[in-house]
Amino acid sequence: RNDAKELSLVGIFKLRGDGRSPNRRIAFSPYLFGGVALLAHNPKAKTPDSPEFDNKWVALQPLGTEGQGQPGYAKPYSLVTYSIPFGAGFTWKINAEWNISIEGGFRFSGSDYLDDVGGLFPDPTVLKTPLARAMSNRTLEPISARTGQDRTDIVRRITQPNADPSVDPFADPLGGWQQGDYRGSPTRNDQYLLSSITVSYILPSKIKCPPIR
């Protein structure tokens, strides 16, 4: 998971005219939007369900799961980046004072580490702690840390064409998930979707003030 926070500057283009005053706005108004945003994020994952690690959520960036910060490896990735939001939505007029809007937006981010995965599997001996080594390569975990379910069948189907039930898929290191293999996709940054429902109150165009006595 990632606890992401976004501060955006967005412009809206309405596909239909919306009237010259709040009282004359149309009943249904589609729109497009786009802009720029500042994104603060903090990827986390659950540790293995074992006495050593206690199956708890931990922040991944300080661990350097791809060797970040060690000699010969990249520096730690930033937890602040940008994103490019764009999308579309619809606004419905409920009555003279209230609107409801539904929109969906796509975000191109400036980071490939919203999920802490972007480069290659590192040499495990350079990682700083046993926790960093455990979180760097999780392919041999028989139990899913997040759900608590057994991973044996799904790993067997992925790694063995015939899915032989007599073979333990965790007995040997899995090919393609070892030092120097791609851990993520280094050719493009991470992207994400965001949807929202908004209820808004329309201020009257003229506010009548009580007479001064």
Residue spans for each PLM region:
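Flexible glycine-rich, low-complexity coil/linker segments exposed to the extracellular/periplasmic environment
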Residues: 47-48, 55-70, 125-190
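Extracellular loop and loop/strand-boundary signature of outer-membrane beta-barrel proteins
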Residues: 1-4, 19-21, 70-76, 182-185
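Outer-membrane beta-barrel "beta-signal"
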Residues: 12, 188-213
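Outer-membrane beta-barrel proteins
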Residues: 20-22, 41-46, 99, 110-115, ...
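Short loop/turn motifs that connect adjacent beta-strands in outer-membrane beta-barrel proteins
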Residues: 17-29, 94-97, 205-213
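Residues that define the transmembrane beta-barrel architecture of outer-membrane proteins
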Residues: 3-7, 28, 76-84, 191-195
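Gram-negative (and chloroplast) outer-membrane scaffold detector with strong preference
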Residues: 1-58
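Residues on the lipid-exposed face of transmembrane beta-strands in outer-membrane beta-barrel proteins
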Residues: 9-15, 34-38, 86-92, 102-106, ...
